[in-house]
A protein has these predicted regions:
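Predominantly extracytoplasmic/ectodomain segments of secreted and cell-surface proteins
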Residues: 10-128
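Short carbohydrate-recognition loop motifs
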Residues: 190-210
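Single conserved hydrophobic/aromatic residue that forms the stacking wall/gate
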Residues: 1-12
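Extracellular carbohydrate-recognition regions
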Residues: 129-174
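Residues within well-ordered beta-strands of beta-sheet-rich folds
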Residues: 136, 256-262, 287-289, 328-334, ...
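Extracellular carbohydrate recognition and processing domains
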Residues: 295-342, 363
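Extracellular-facing segments of soluble proteins and assemblies that are Gly/Ser/Thr-biased and enriched
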Residues: 206-296
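Extracellular carbohydrate recognition
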Residues: 341-344, 354-377
Length: 378
C-alpha cells in the first residue's frame, strides 16, 4: 500500500519544551513523619479558668484521645473557654493551635489535627472524662467551737478530725489525774510535702490513759481525719464510736480516690486496756465509703461504717510497712448495690494513722502523711 507525504509528516515526532514552576516547600524525602501530641496541659497562669482542671491529662496514643477531669464545682459556662497549652512532635504543627480557647462544656469534644513535617496528619479528640474534687491540704485555720478561747487547735478546712477529743483531754484531763500537753494528732506538715507548701499529717499520740468522770481516755489517741463531723462529747456516754459521723451529702457517683501517702508505724502498740502488745505492728488505713440515707440527719459512725447494710460501695487500703517516700495510692470503689441518682447518699473518705484506733488499739507515734487527694466521679 502506498503512503502519501501527508502520512509521513503525521508520524514525525514534534519536540516540545515544558517549563514547570514549583511553589511551596520542596521535600527532600528525609522529613519527619512523626505527628504526635506530646503534652496537653492547662495552666492557670495562662487562663484563670484552667484551674478548674484537676489531676493529670491522659493522652491515649492507641485510641488517639485526650481526656481530663474538671472540678465538681465547675459550671458549664466556665468550661466554654479552657485554654490548653500543647506540645507536638518536632517540626510538626497542630490545629487548632496551642493557647487558643476551646469549648469543652456539656460533653463537647474538640478535634486536634497534627501535621508532621512531611505532611502526614493525625487527629486527636479531646474531651472532659468526668468531674472530681481535689484536696491539696493547703487551707488550715486554728481554734475550737468547744473552747473558743483556745487558738492553737488545728482545723483542716472542709474535713473533720479527732483534735477536739485531745483538746477535751487537755482541758478536763486533770479531773481524772491525766496531764497531756503534747501535739495535736492532726496538723499541717510544712517540711514534708508532696507538692505545695503543706500536707496533712496524722500522728497517733500518747494521751496517757485513764478516765474522766467514768469516760475512758485511751492510752493512745489514734490520728484520724475524714469527711463528716466529729463530736468529742459523744464519747461521754462511754461509746467512743459515737464521736464520729462519717460522710457528707453527695449527689455524684464516686469511682475512686487517689493521692499520695507516707507512713511510719509506731514502735509501741497498746490495746484498749493500755497494755503494751509486744510484737504487734500498727497499720494505717485509707478508705472510702458511699452509703444510702433517708435524710441528711442519718449517719454511720465508727461502729458500723464498714459493716452497715446501707453501704453501696467501699474501698479499704491498709499497710503496716514503712513508706519512706511519698507513694501514690488508689482506692477503687467496689459497688455492692446499684447507684440510683434519685436516692440520697453520703460519702466518706477516712484517713487514719492507726487502723484500729477507733477501738483504742494503736501505737504511739504512728505517723501518716497525706497529700494531693482527688475524688473522681463518674
Amino acid at each position: 500500500m502506498s503512503r502519501g507525504l501527508g502520512d509521513v509528516y503525521k508520524r514525525q515526532p514534534v519536540p516540545y519544551t515544558v517549563k514547570v514552576a514549583y511553589s511551596g516547600t520542596k521535600l527532600s524525602g528525609t522529613e519527619s513523619s512523626e505527628a504526635k501530641i506530646l503534652s496537653f496541659v492547662f495552666d492557670k497562669e495562662v487562663a484563670a479558668v484552667d484551674s478548674l482542671v484537676v489531676g493529670d491529662v491522659v493522652i491515649n496514643e492507641e485510641s488517639k484521645t485526650i481526656t481530663f477531669m474538671v472540678a465538681d464545682t465547675a459550671k458549664a459556662e466556665y468550661l466554654t473557654a479552657l485554654v490548653p497549652t500543647i506540645e507536638v512532635s518536632e517540626k510538626a504543627t497542630v490545629t487548632p493551635a496551642s493557647g487558643v480557647a476551646q469549648d469543652f462544656s456539656n460533653g463537647k469534644t474538640v478535634t486536634y489535627t497534627v501535621t508532621a513535617e512531611n505532611g502526614t496528619t493525625v487527629e486527636y479528640v479531646a474531651s472532659i472524662s468526668g468531674n472530681a474534687s481535689f484536696y491539696d491540704f493547703e487551707s488550715w485555720s486554728y481554734g475550737s467551737t468547744m473552747y473558743p478561747e483556745e487558738q492553737d487547735c488545728p482545723i483542716l478546712n472542709g474535713w473533720a478530725c479527732c483534735n477536739d477529743a485531745v483538746l477535751l483531754i487537755k482541758k478536763m484531763g486533770a479531773l481524772g489525774g491525766i496531764t497531756y500537753e503534747g501535739e495535736y494528732p492532726v496538723r499541717p506538715s510544712t517540711d514534708d510535702v508532696h507538692a505545695g507548701e503543706k500536707a496533712l499529717l496524722l500522728e497517733s499520740v500518747d494521751t496517757k490513759g485513764g478516765n474522766i468522770f467514768g469516760t475512758p481516755v485511751p492510752k493512745v489517741t489514734a490520728a484520724t481525719a475524714f469527711l463528716g463531723t466529729f463530736n468529742a462529747f459523744g464519747a461521754l456516754g462511754g461509746d467512743p464510736m459515737a464521736t464520729t459521723s462519717f460522710g457528707v451529702m453527695y449527689d455524684k457517683q464516686p469511682l475512686k480516690v487517689t493521692g499520695f501517702y507516707k507512713y511510719t508505724p509506731g514502735a509501741e502498740f497498746y490495746n484498749a486496756n493500755g497494755e503494751l502488745q509486744a510484737g504487734v505492728a500498727d497499720k494505717c488505713s485509707l478508705s472510702a465509703v458511699l452509703y444510702e440515707v433517708s435524710s441528711e440527719d442519718e449517719t454511720l459512725n465508727g461502729g458500723n461504717i464498714y459493716t452497715s447494710d446501707k453501704i453501696v460501695a467501699k474501698a479499704v487500703f491498709t499497710n503496716d510497712k514503712a513508706v519512706e517516700s511519698y507513694a501514690p495510692f488508689e482506692l477503687n470503689l467496689e459497688y455492692v448495690k446499684d447507684y440510683d441518682s434519685s436516692k440520697l447518699y453520703k460519702f466518706a473518705v477516712i484517713f487514719s494513722a492507726s487502723a484500729d484506733g477507733a477501738s483504742y488499739n494503736a501505737a504511739v507515734g504512728s505517723k501518716l502523711l497525706i497529700d494531693d487527694v482527688t475524688i473522681i466521679n463518674k
